[in-house]
Amino acid sequence: LRDLPELLDAVCGYYKRRFHVEITPDQVASCAGSQEGVGHIGMVLCDEGDTVLLPTPCYPVFIAGSLLGGAKPWYYPLTKEHGFLPYVKDIPEDVARKAKYMIVSLPANPVGSVGSPELYAELVAFAKKYDILIIHDNAYSDIIFDGAVGNSFFNTPGAMDVGVEFFSLSKSFNVT
């Protein structure tokens, strides 16, 4: 089963216009929704007993997806002290070494925090250091307030080497 070339081209065009990110059709895959992709990626990436890094609070499908893959979630807290953003310095080195992937959801629902270029650069460096895949849930990039701007993880140098990004048509375009 292949995606329609017109759909892939439209996604590439949208990413260029909206996020100023150049991607090619071979870097795009459609799912029946970003929830499906995030919920099933653990079955592809994980073996029984692997560790995955999940935010808390988080969308329940993040947990279910990791468990479907046989992985053990390790929860990193999103605290007020750090602006409800991932703070990789609090992830113990022994945990980071075992992790297959880390899910990052920015802009974050329900807290509304938005990632900065500096944070994304830290995540890229963390992923490279520990050979971890960053799974960026970008479903809410167009639903933010107070003048904030949602962005793509792929705007960060090196992010395409260590990341997968999920974008949702249902949130931005009410397409389900």
List the model feature ranges, each with a label.
Residues 1-35, 40, 90:
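N-terminal small-domain helix-loop-helix segment of the aminotransferase-like
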Residues 79-147, 151-154:
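Active-site phosphate-binding strand-loop segment of PLP-dependent enzymes
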Residues 22-28, 48-51, 98, 160-163:
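Short acidic capping loops at alpha-helix termini that bridge into adjacent secondary structure
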Residues 44-66:
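Conserved PLP-anchoring active-site segment centered on the Schiff-base-forming lysine
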Residues 34-38, 58-62, 173:
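Conserved coil-to-alpha-helix start sites within the AMP-binding
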Residues 50, 71, 126-133, 160-161:
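A short helix->loop->beta-strand "cap" motif at the edges of active sites that frequently abuts
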Residues 149, 156-176:
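Active-site PLP attachment segment
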